[in-house]
Amino acid sequence: MSRVCGLTGAHGYVGSALRRGLTAAGWTVVSLSRREKVAEDEIRWSLDEASGSGPNTLREELRRREISAVVHAAWDLRLVRPSDLQRVNVQGSLRLLEEARAAGVRRFVFISTISAFDEAESDYGKTKLAVERAVALQGGVVIRPGLVYGERPGGMFGALKTQAGRGAIIPLLGNGRYAQYLVHEDDLAAAVVAAVSLEKAPERPVTVAHPEPRPLRSLMRQLAESQGSHPRFVSVPWPLVYQGLKVTEALGLKLGFRSDSVIGLVRHNRHPDLNASLLGVAPRPFTDPGREQTQRNSG
């Protein structure tokens, strides 16, 4: 079996961590990129484009490069309308799944989210769940990461850390007790490395996160203190924040935090199936790596 892996979202925060992990484990990584000009180790591909026809279809590129596994981590977070989410993220993912199947790719790994569960209320969770079901039907591996963090975090965790270090008074959603399950980027990468090598996919999604939840207020306080800040948190009713963000989105304004993310935080899965052991991974407990780096530099 070739050890060549196609990876979508390789230039994003999570995708970059997965690429480092796969490369360190001896895999050759080919990025499926939406960039206009792609490098030699990339294939031009986008969620919002059909796979194409003619001599240069995606399936033919996957075959030509002898790609044996595809890890799908791309997701367009700029979209807010449910119809756009369905058209781009869901249908684009299903096209990729079909192209990989037609190309004879042995293992398909979908990076979903801990926000995907049967009772999910966020559009993010519901659309990820729709793709999960299609991947499972074709024998793929579904990984549901918790809130991903690392030394130089991006994504939701990065946004929370930036917010926590901004000032003496910080608004906090509701009572701040909303549980957050976290996973270090290296532990998530280890789970993906294990997944691409599996002979048989697990029969259910694999949730990769440390089993001890952190209340949002506690997490924000720790992130603030790691940046030398000791803010006062002011509780703001989450529906007020949600409606305010909906208005800004309707006006086309981008604030770095989406209304749907509010739903994901407050309507979280209270009882996630924390089964990372299915992939031989034991996620580490949370410590802020940025603070550890500062301590090492000053030591």
Mark where each language-model region is.
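Mid/C-terminal beta-alpha module of Rossmann-like enzyme folds, strongest
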Residues: 194-255, 280-299
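Substrate-positioning beta->alpha
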Residues: 154-159, 174-197, 203-207
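N-terminal Rossmann NAD(P)H-binding glycine-rich loop of SDR-like oxidoreductase domains
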Residues: 5-25
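SDR active-site strand-loop-helix element
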Residues: 8, 32, 70-74, 108-114, ...
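NAD(P)H-binding glycine-rich loop region in Rossmannoid oxidoreductase-like domains
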Residues: 47-94, 99, 114-119
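Short alpha-helix in the Rossmann-fold core of NAD(P)-dependent oxidoreductases
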Residues: 86-93, 109, 128, 181
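Flexible, glycine-rich beta-alpha linker
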Residues: 119-122, 143-159, 178-179
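Conserved beta-loop-beta element that borders a ligand/cofactor-binding pocket
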Residues: 103, 133-151
